[in-house]
């Protein structure tokens, strides 16, 4: 029985899991939407939501606490200055998980995890411009 056991192992060591969650959190913050497997998305959701809830206070202690979880300074700045302000009045539920079928190679369930009320231009603005230029040509 797995009573009182929190989280998923994801078939990796604990240090690998912590590093992976931190890296996925940076990617989610910078792009505001990422594609990953469903169990990883479900594990990332409480990790990033706790960080954003802390970031709504936006003082030095919170900044240091967020920096201890996420090692990227640009991501921490975005969390404190943009996401903390954006979700100031929202009492949780900052992310959504959208199931997206199965991966071709191993049939792993794939999902998108994204911020609610996200900035559409945050994810690959240059990529969208290149695609629109190709359509025009």
Curated annotation (Swiss-Prot):
* Short name of any one Pfam family annotated for the protein: Ribosomal_L17
- Which cellular component, as a GO term, is one annotated location? cytosolic large ribosomal subunit
Instruction: Give the UniProt keywords, A-Z.
Output: Ribonucleoprotein, Ribosomal protein
Q: One MF term in GO for this entry?
A: structural constituent of ribosome
Metal-binding as a keyword of this entry, yes or no, is: no
Which PANTHER family does this UniProt record tie to the protein?
A: LARGE RIBOSOMAL SUBUNIT PROTEIN BL17M, RIBOSOMAL PROTEIN L17
What family is this? Belongs to the bacterial ribosomal protein bL17 family.
- What name is this protein filed under? Large ribosomal subunit protein bL17
């Amino acid at each position: 029985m797995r009573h009182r056991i929190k989280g998923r192992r994801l078939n990796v060591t604990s240090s690998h899991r912590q590093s992976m969650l931190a890296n996925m959190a940076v990617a989610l913050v910078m792009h505001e939407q990422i594609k990953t497997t469903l169990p990883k998305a479900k594990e990332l959701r409480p990790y990033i939501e706790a960080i954003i809830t802390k970031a709504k206070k936006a003082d030095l202690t919170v900044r240091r606490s967020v920096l201890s979880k996420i090692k990227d300074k640009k991501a921490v700045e975005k969390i404190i200055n943009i996401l903390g302000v954006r979700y100031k009045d929202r009492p949780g539920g900052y992310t959504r998980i959208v199931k997206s079928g199965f991966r071709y190679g191993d049939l792993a369930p794939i999902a998108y995890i994204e911020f609610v009320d996200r900035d559409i231009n945050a994810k690959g603005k240059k990529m969208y411009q290149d695609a629109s230029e190709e359509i025009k040509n």
